Each structure stands twice: as C-alpha cells, then as structure tokens.
Regions:
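Short inter-helical turns and helix N-cap capping residues of alpha-solenoid HEAT/ARM repeat scaffolds
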Residues: 17-18, 49-50, 80-81, 111-112, ...
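Eukaryotic acidic, Ser/Thr-rich intrinsically disordered low-complexity regions
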Residues: 194-229
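HEAT/HEAT-like alpha-solenoid repeats
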Residues: 114, 132, 168-173, 205-216
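Buried hydrophobic core positions in alpha-solenoid tandem helical repeats
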Residues: 9-10, 40-42, 71-73, 103-105, ...
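Structural detector for internal amphipathic alpha-helices that build alpha-solenoid repeat scaffolds
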Residues: 1, 11-12, 19-33, 43-44, ...
Length: 229
C-alpha cells in the first residue's frame, strides 16, 4: 500500500467516530514494523485532532510490544512539543511495566507542568515500593500544590498493586497534611486516606470523574484529630 492510500485512509478515519474504521486504520499501520513505519504511525498519532482516533493510535504503540515502547522512549529524547511529549509519557505509563520507569523519572523535574503531571501519574502506574521513595522526594521539591496532590494519588495507584506500601503512604500523609492549606490537595490526601485506611472522613470521590465532594475543612479536622490520638 502506498503513501497516498494510507493518507486517504487516515482522512477517512479522522472524519468518523467509528471504532471499526479507527481500528482498521491502526491495523494497517501495525503491518509496517520498520523504523519508517513507526515514524509514520507516530506522525498520525501526533497530528490527530480526533480524540477517539488519537487514543487508539496511541495504544497501538503498546501493541507493537517492546519495540513500540523503545520507539516512544527515543521520542522522549527528541520531541520538542511539550504536549506531544506529555502524551508519550502517558503512553509509556500505560504499559504498566516497571522496566520502563527509568525512562519517566527525569521528567518529574521538567519545567512544564503538564509534563511533570504525566510523569507523576506514570510513576503511579509503573512503580513499586521504591517509587514511593522517589515520589516522596519529589513532593518536597514540587512547587505546584495540585501536582503535590497528584503525587499522593500516584502513591495510591502503587498501593493498589503493592499493598505492603500502605503504612508508609499513610504515615507520609499524616506528616504532610498539617502543613498544607490548598483545598484540592487536601481533598486528594483525604480520599486517599479513606481508601487505604477504610475510615470515612466525610468526602466522596466519583469513581468515573474523580470529582471530590464534601466539606474539606471538616474532613481535615477529623483527620488531624485522628493524628493527635
């Protein structure tokens, strides 16, 4: 199939929400495992303004196995667009393979907030108890309060796979919460505590949207009283 045919199928895929059309286009790209074929795949992924198609094309790199992830790792070194780089970090995180965590760690200190956000989340998907230590260290230097909240959320993701991390996460939150004042960060800390300890402090987290509701001040007060016991 020549370049014009692929381009034509891409335009067709862009113009529809059909999963079948999107998946067929991905399968067409996956037939070419050469460096040029993966580069073409990446260009279409990066270019797509169709969110459904973009998601399918992104996940397609994981279908390429280790070669696909290694290609993405090389893209992290050369990609100059911050949003595109953050999307690549996200995809590597979705591999859920600890082997690829070292690719992500340098971006915890990136100047761009979106890149740091995706790196934090990816650490939660890829990491284990050792990654908890890394996230604790990053928490101390992260100036964005909401991103500090996502660090705590990433710790919870690690807990879901590694239950032995529970106490060190709980202890960390107990130490850090009294000094925090940003409501969104406090809300994340509290719902994570609720998940890990099974103690209800008065907040609810929507399982679909992640939106947190409830009286944060009252919930924080309940946590602080528990800490002082």
């Amino acid at each position: 199939m020549n370049d014009n045919d692929v381009s034509s199928y891409y335009k067709e895929a862009l113009a529809t929400d059909s999963f079948t059309v999107h998946n067929n286009f991905l399968n067409m790209l996956l037939k070419n495992g050469s460096a040029l074929g993966m580069e073409r795949h990446y260009c279409y992924f990066k270019d797509s303004k169709n969110a459904d198609l973009k998601r399918i094309l992104g996940n397609g790199f994981l279908k390429r196995g280790k070669e696909g992830v290694l290609f993405l790792e090389e893209k992290l070194k050369t990609e100059t667009d911050a949003l595109a780089k953050s999307n690549v970090i996200h995809l590597i995180g979705l591999s859920y393979n600890k082997e690829y965590l070292p690719y992500i760690l340098p971006y915890l200190d990136d100047a761009d907030n979106e890149i740091r956000y995706k790196a934090i989340i990816a650490c939660g998907w890829l990491g284990d108890a050792e990654a908890i230590k890394i996230l604790k260290e990053h928490y101390a230097t992260e100036k964005d309060a909401l991103l500090r909240g996502f660090i705590v959320s990433a710790m919870r993701q690690i807990f879901f796979r590694h239950k032995e991390t529970k106490q060190q996460i709980v202890d960390f939150i107990y130490v850090k919460m009294p000094e925090e004042t940003y409501n969104e960060l406090l809300a994340i800390m509290i719902v994570v505590l609720q998940d890990l300890t099974k103690v209800k402090f008065g907040l609810k987290e929507d399982s679909c949207s992640g939106e947190i509701s409830g009286d944060i001040a009252k919930a924080k007060d309940k946590v602080l009283k528990k800490i002082k016991k």
